[in-house]
Design a protein with these regions (language model features):
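Cys-based phosphatases of the PTP/DUSP/CDC25 superfamily and their flanking regulatory architecture
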Residues: 1-241
Length: 241
């Protein structure tokens, strides 16, 4: 940690960042799938497209013949353990079904939502992809999602959902942790609450099994997720606590 602080103070950390090769970011041939005409409407932003080789691939269905969703696999090795994440954009009304298919197909038990609310500045930044009340059940083409518990903390909410097939067969319980103090256009104003949130996420993830992917989303799928993954892995490496 002291070495990193020294790099920040001297500015050398910025030189390291500038030295990162830009070839992948500037090579449009590496993300063709998301630009196909049948997939364009499944992207929240036209300029935020997953790489073809790391994108999450769903089983093709009639409603989505390409099996496309704007989401990417992220794997980080810490010592002898590989931690898996899926970084994705917030669901659109069109992609709610695919979002839950992704959860089912990738054996996901933990979902992290880095969005304070579904609406911001009179604009929907996330579709309502889960029920907010126990008496309400979300039904998609293939699944039923039921809220079974909710704990409201100072800056985050912990929910648990039961996921069923449409004919009532139980698939799994999904833990959902929403950080409510993150404005879509700003960093959190207070760091400790976010650290507490990440610690809670890590605790829940250990309960369900750290080797299973953790799904993380904000609005675009590229900013807040990286902060969460980096913070979690830094904590795992004992860089911060």
């Amino acid at each position: 940690l002291s070495e990193f602080i020294l790099k920040v103070e001297t500015g050398s950390v910025y030189d390291e960042f500038d030295s990162i090769p830009l070839c992948r970011m500037t090579n449009n041939n590496l993300f063709q799938d998301g630009r196909l005409s049948e997939n364009i409407e499944r992207n929240r932003f036209p300029d935020v497209i997953p790489y073809d080789d790391t994108r999450v691939r769903l089983i093709p269905v009639k409603e989505n013949l390409q099996g496309y969703i704007n989401a990417s696999h992220v794997k980080i090795r810490i010592q002898n353990t590989i931690y898996s994440y899926i970084a994705t954009e917030s669901p659109l009304p069109l992609t709610i079904y695919d979002f839950w298919r992704m959860i089912s197909l990738n054996n996901i038990h933990v979902v992290v939502m880095l969005i304070g609310d579904f609406i911001e500045n009179d604009h929907q930044i996330c579709a309502r992809y889960f029920p907010l009340k126990k008496e309400n059940i979300l039904r998609t083409n293939e699944f039923e999602i039921e809220l079974i518990s909710e704990q409201i903390r100072v800056d985050f909410i912990i929910r648990h959902f039961r996921m069923y097939t449409i004919n009532g067969q139980r698939i799994r319980t999904v833990a959902h942790l929403q950080y409510t103090a993150w404005d879509d256009n700003q960093l959190p104003l207070e760091c400790q609450s976010f650290i507490d949130f990440v610690n809670e996420v890590d605790c829940v993830r250990r309960y369900y099994g750290e080797t299973n992917p953790c799904l993380v989303h904000c609005t675009a799928g590229i900013e807040s997720e990286h902060t969460k993954c980096a913070k979690s892995d830094a904590r795992t490496s004992n860089v911060i606590s």
